[in-house]
Curated annotation (Swiss-Prot):
This is Beta-1,3-galactosyl-O-glycosyl-glycoprotein beta-1,6-N-acetylglucosaminyltransferase 4. It is an enzyme of class 2 (transferase). Pathway: Protein modification; protein glycosylation. The chain crosses the membrane at residues 14-34. Residues 35-455 are lumenal. It comes from the Eukaryota. Keywords: Disulfide bond, Glycoprotein, Glycosyltransferase, Golgi apparatus, Membrane, Signal-anchor, Transferase, Transmembrane, Transmembrane helix. It comes from Mus musculus. One of its GO terms (molecular function) is beta-1,3-galactosyl-O-glycosyl-glycoprotein beta-1,6-N-acetylglucosaminyltransferase activity. The gene is Gcnt4. Its EC number is 2.4.1.102. Belongs to the glycosyltransferase 14 family. InterPro entries: Glyco_trans_14 (IPR003406). It is found in: Golgi apparatus membrane. It catalyses: a 3-O-[beta-D-galactosyl-(1->3)-N-acetyl-alpha-D-galactosaminyl]-L-seryl-[protein] + UDP-N-acetyl-alpha-D-glucosamine = 3-O-{beta-D-galactosyl-(1->3)-[N-acetyl-beta-D-glucosaminyl-(1->6)]-N-acetyl-alpha-D-galactosaminyl}-L-seryl-[protein] + UDP + H(+); a 3-O-[beta-D-galactosyl-(1->3)-N-acetyl-alpha-D-galactosaminyl]-L-threonyl-[protein] + UDP-N-acetyl-alpha-D-glucosamine = a 3-O-{beta-D-galactosyl-(1->3)-[N-acetyl-beta-D-glucosaminyl-(1->6)]-N-acetyl-alpha-D-galactosaminyl}-L-threonyl-[protein] + UDP + H(+).
Amino acid sequence: MKIFRCCFKYTLQQKLFILLLTLWLFSLLKLLNVGRLLFPQRDIYLVEYSLSTSPFVRNRFPESGDAARDNVNCSGVYEHEPLEIGKSLEIRRRSIIDLEDGDVVAMTSDCDVYQTLRQYHEKLVSREEEDFPIAYSLVVHKDAIMVERLIRAIYNQHNLYCIHYDLKSPDTFKAAMNNLAKCFPNIFIASKLETVEYAHISRLQADWNCLSDLLKSSVQWKYVINLCGQDFPLKSNFELVTELKSLQGRNMLETVRPPSAKTERFTYHHELRQVPYDYMKLPVKTNVSKGAPPHNIQVFVGSAYFVLSRAFVKYIFNSSLVEDFFAWSKDTYSPDEHFWATLIRIPGIPGGISSSSQDVSDLQSKTRLVKWFYYEGFLYPNCTGSHLRSVCIYGAAELRWLLNEGHWFANKFDSKVDPILMKCLAEKLEEQQRKLIALSSEKFMTEGTRQSHTL
């Protein structure tokens, strides 16, 4: 027994010595910067190269002489030129580094510098757009740089923007959103913020809070559109105004009769519970049946996304029927996916459609273009990016399809999946805005000349 204890003690001493020696060697290698030689990292790609190598961000990278090789011709991507598509695919194989929330906080800390960096002063606007302001409700919770790019893409000084961030979002994300709001008189943070849980009434409440604030603004916006941080526009502001005018007061959203698979979402009581996967908390179905909807309302389903007229929004904030239906929906699963789709069918509501009218599918509604895995190759081409919960995160090869499909916005985008697509989309939309405003100005000048000749 004595010999065993001695050997055991000696073995422990050996293990401790080897552990300390290993730690010392790793520290030495790190100090001498030998790690890159022994464990070479993948080549990196900086999504925002000029900013990431500037003093305006928190995590600054050294400049690289190889930056020029990363230039991708967006017209070539649009035309599916093999060389440009190949470049985008090569970039995706690298370690993609985008700006972190702290970087967005840093670059928005000085509003004048930020607006110059992002060239807000170069945004063009027509008289038609000035006379047709649009309101936006942005419900966001992560990736400040994605939200910043979205706002920059849809920003016009005559529009109005409400940002609702999740109360459980990281503090740096909240700081970035607060900084963005401080830099513009027409961007603000919702006066009431929610802790948003997936498929819970809190998601609907977040949009509701923004709608309430937007109505109180002095800006007489014509339509309101809700977006999330993974959305991006497919139309320039000029095009969007033209499309909205053509609605002539009607609303635009998905509204279909519920398939049997979805009826349990609102016929049974759901409770918010802890779950052992992604969302942490989720409304879980119980065995308790719900009563019928108030006022004999017929339930329709759709998506959380809408394009609503000002008259519609004013109506719902002054309707006891809508108030009762909102309360009834609180213990359902994903109420935002039936609430708006149902309201638009209520008789007499501004811009609504009859409950007997045909279904309006997600492809017929132009509010959001989403590519579902199980419809790929049937309703639309295959995804060239990746998938998250059966939804396509688009790749650069889908640029042309996205722009030509006819929708106004699309979901999902992720710069760390494909950074080239969002760059090319932004570039194409800016080109379209400049082109249409130039044509509009020529038309205005021509009409003015005709009137002067008439006089």
